[in-house]
A protein has these predicted regions:
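Active-site signature of alpha/beta-hydrolase-fold catalytic machinery across serine-
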Residues: 118-122
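Short beta-to-alpha linker loops that shape the active-site pocket of alpha/beta-hydrolase fold enzymes
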Residues: 36, 60-70, 136, 240-242
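Short glycine-enriched, charge-decorated loop/helix-capping segments at active-site entrances
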Residues: 46-47, 75-80, 250-253
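Short, surface-exposed "cap/lid" segments of acyl-processing enzymes
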Residues: 7-10, 19-65
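Terminal, non-globular segments
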Residues: 5, 15-16, 55, 62-63, ...
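The alpha/beta-hydrolase serine catalytic core
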Residues: 125-267
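Gly/Ala-rich beta-loop-alpha elbow adjacent to hydrolase catalytic centers
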Residues: 107-117, 134
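Catalytic nucleophile-loop/oxyanion-hole region of alpha/beta-hydrolase
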Residues: 69-103
């Protein structure tokens, strides 16, 4: 694994490049795109496992942190979805430079899935294969989930939680918006989540997408059906066990479900 920084001086991004095993080198490069906040912390080990397995099979892999997240430059209140889209494109250029690969797969989990689709819309000629793990397709619903999970975390942190927190959550839409379990939510991110809808996430017809999601996630299933209806090459597979992405009970716990790893490896190799 090669740790590195890339990007312009004003926007340095941290990455980890896993070169494909020389004896099994392929022409495929894979970009792994993080989810948001605690979800990114919990999937960090899974991404390392994925990258290692793929590199052993000869695939070149780049993991990276968006600006304002992880080990990249910038504060966490500088992160927003539109800049994530630009960071995906910047990371793609770095992966192409490092690997010399001819074909590319972009994998994004949760909000990272939305960033991947938005990036693909800006680069249709690249025709990347997209792998979307439980993608966020409804911004307002996701923002509400973050607020609710933040209040849960506050309640767990205090031996005598304040009942007013729950009332605020239900009656004051502007409450608990600035932070999600220790991670700042920038004003730009809040605005972009409020505006994010399924019809803004059309998969380019030149690309294709494979979706791994909870079958009970109606928003994702409806989005998949809508994409198929417009002629996009989108397939989906469900996981029998729902994942708890953002939970203070599992704060800082690694999320490495064996079946998800296997499904992701199969989806990337399609």
């Amino acid at each position: 694994m090669l740790p590195l920084y890339f990007g312009p001086p004003s926007r340095r991004l941290f990455g980890a490049f896993h070169e494909g095993s020389p004896g099994r080198a392929q022409s495929l490069g894979v970009l792994l795109c993080n989810p948001f906040g605690q979800e990114a912390i919990r999937t960090h080990r899974l991404y390392r496992v994925l990258a290692g397995r793929l590199a052993q099979a000869g695939v070149h892999v780049l993991r990276f942190d968006y600006f304002g997240t992880g080990d990249s430059a910038g504060e966490d209140d500088a992160a927003d979805l539109e800049s994530w889209r630009d960071d995906v494109l910047l990371a793609q250029r770095e992966l192409q430079h490092l690997s010399g690969a001819l074909e590319f797969t972009w994998m994004g989990a949760r909000l990272g899935g939305a960033a991947v689709v938005r990036a693909a819309q800006q680069m249709p000629a690249a025709e990347p294969h997209l792998v979307l793990w439980d993608p966020v397709v409804n911004g307002p619903a996701y923002a509400q989930l973050l607020r609710a999970k933040h209040v849960e975390a506050l309640e767990i942190s205090y031996s005598l939680p304040d009942p007013a927190w729950r009332r605020q959550l239900q009656t004051e839409p502007a409450s608990f918006r600035d932070e999600a379990i220790g991670i700042a939510v920038s004003p730009a991110m809040r605005e972009q989540l409020a505006a994010l809808r399924e019809d803004q996430l059309d998969v380019p017809l030149a690309s294709d997408a494979f979706v791994i999601a909870d079958p009970a996630n109606r928003a994702v299933q409806a989005w998949v059906a809508a994409q198929q209806a417009r002629g996009a090459r989108v397939e989906s597979v469900g996981l029998p066990q729902a994942l708890e992405w953002t939970s203070d009970d599992s704060l800082n716990a690694a999320l490495v479900p064996a079946q998800a790893v296997q499904e992701l490896l199969l989806a990337i190799d399609r």
